């Protein structure tokens, strides 16, 4: 089993698809990495040899931030937004949608579960 950037890639999949299991790598970046490393996209992960794995690791380090480095950078960017007090930072702090989505209805993913509000009892005379 090929282990790249701390992730075990699925053995039966093609390498171009297997690389997308790493956080921060999509289809286009996967193809770019394989092109730079000089590896055919149609080869399966189980058929990779050690030199090909090493070439992928080396190219990956040169090309992009992935996994832990990328996650920590994203968290630092969000923390910076919250610290400077900009609109996006306030939305992150309050746990609301950041990119202009509506919040009167929907936005349940960001806001959490539904909070029911009890009705006031009518006063009888």
From Swiss-Prot:
Keywords: Ribonucleoprotein, Ribosomal protein, RNA-binding, rRNA-binding, tRNA-binding
Region (Disordered): 95-125
GO cellular component, one term: cytosol
Entry annotated with the keyword Nucleus: no
Pfam family, any one: Ribosomal_S13
Disulfide-bonded cysteines: none
Signal peptide interval: none
UniProt xrefs under InterPro entries: Rbsml_uS13_C, Ribosomal_uS13, Ribosomal_uS13-like_H2TH, Ribosomal_uS13_bac-type, Ribosomal_uS13_CS
Entry's Gene Ontology BP terms: translation
Highest taxon of the lineage: Bacteria
GO molecular function: rRNA binding; structural constituent of ribosome; tRNA binding
Keyword Ribonucleoprotein applies: yes
Ranges of biased composition (kind: Basic residues): 105-125
Sequence similarity: Belongs to the universal ribosomal protein uS13 family.
Role summary: Located at the top of the head of the 30S subunit, it contacts several helices of the 16S rRNA. In the 70S ribosome it contacts the 23S rRNA (bridge B1a) and protein L5 of the 50S subunit (bridge B1b), connecting the 2 subunits; these bridges are implicated in subunit movement. Contacts the tRNAs in the A and P-sites.
Assembly description: Part of the 30S ribosomal subunit. Forms a loose heterodimer with protein S19. Forms two bridges to the 50S subunit in the 70S ribosome.
NCBIfam families to which the protein is assigned, alphabetical: uS13_bact
Protein name: Small ribosomal subunit protein uS13
UniProt lineage: Bacteria, Pseudomonadati, Spirochaetota, Spirochaetia, Leptospirales
Gene: rpsM
